[in-house]
């Protein structure tokens, strides 16, 4: 694997409600150690870490009709899980739709940071990671996936999500070891 071209880590929906709360799944818990170690290495190497967090308005966001209340703005469920140790130099981009880019400041933040490659981590490869990757690709970013730091509700969703990202956006999936060496 070649060095990544001006990378940033995008951490998608690693929130209390997705890992231990209303939309919890064991597969979300399973990626916490790998995500933690990847973020630690990225921070040590000066790679920006950006959290793309669901942050819904109760009673307004139509997504809540499909998924029920989750990640409601101002609640503990909308907070980054403590294991990931959100720090002062990290960035947080709240989102009200699946994509971290849709009507948020993510694109301008990445441009101001000089980012050219986004490393996708978090939940879920077939949903929010997929839509964030799609918009990243359409905006001209290179997209790669941290295969040990992403997951989905089921193995089938995870595998199909990775395959879709590869087929549609050329997003190769790499191990933490490979990614850290490429920072």
Give, region by region, the residue ranges found by the protein language model.
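Short glycine-enriched, charge-decorated loop/helix-capping segments at active-site entrances
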Residues: 22-29, 65-71
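Acidic-leg catalytic submotif of subtilisin-like serine proteases
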Residues: 8-14
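A short alpha/beta connector and helix-capping loop motif
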Residues: 5, 24-55
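Metal-dependent catalytic neighborhoods of phosphoester/phosphodiester hydrolases
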Residues: 60-64
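Active-site flanking residues adjacent to catalytic metal/cofactor-binding acidic residues
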Residues: 12, 53, 147
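Active-site-adjacent betaalpha module
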Residues: 1-8, 36-45, 68-183
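Short acidic, Gly/Ser-rich segments with clustered Asp/Glu that frequently serve as metal-coordination loops
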Residues: 17-21
């Amino acid at each position: 694997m070649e060095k990544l071209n001006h990378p940033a880590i995008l951490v998608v929906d690693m929130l209390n409600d997705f890992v231990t709360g209303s939309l919890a799944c064991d597969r979300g818990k399973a990626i916490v150690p790998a995500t933690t170690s990847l973020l630690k290495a990225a921070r040590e190497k000066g790679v920006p870490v950006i959290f793309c967090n669901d942050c819904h308005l109760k009673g307004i966001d139509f997504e809540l009709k499909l998924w029920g209340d989750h990640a409601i703005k101002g609640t503990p469920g909308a907070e980054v899980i403590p294991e990931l140790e959100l720090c002062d130099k990290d960035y947080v981009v709240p989102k009200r739709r699946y994509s971290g880019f849709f009507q948020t400041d993510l694109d301008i933040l990445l441009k101001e940071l000089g980012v050219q490659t986004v490393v996708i981590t978090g939940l879920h490869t077939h949903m929010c990671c997929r839509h964030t990757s799609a918009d990243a690709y359409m905006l001209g970013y290179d997209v790669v996936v941290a295969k040990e730091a992403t997951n989905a509700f089921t193995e089938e969703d995870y595998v199909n999500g990775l395959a879709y990202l590869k087929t549609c956006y050329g997003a190769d999936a790499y191990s933490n070891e490979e990614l850290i060496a490429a920072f």
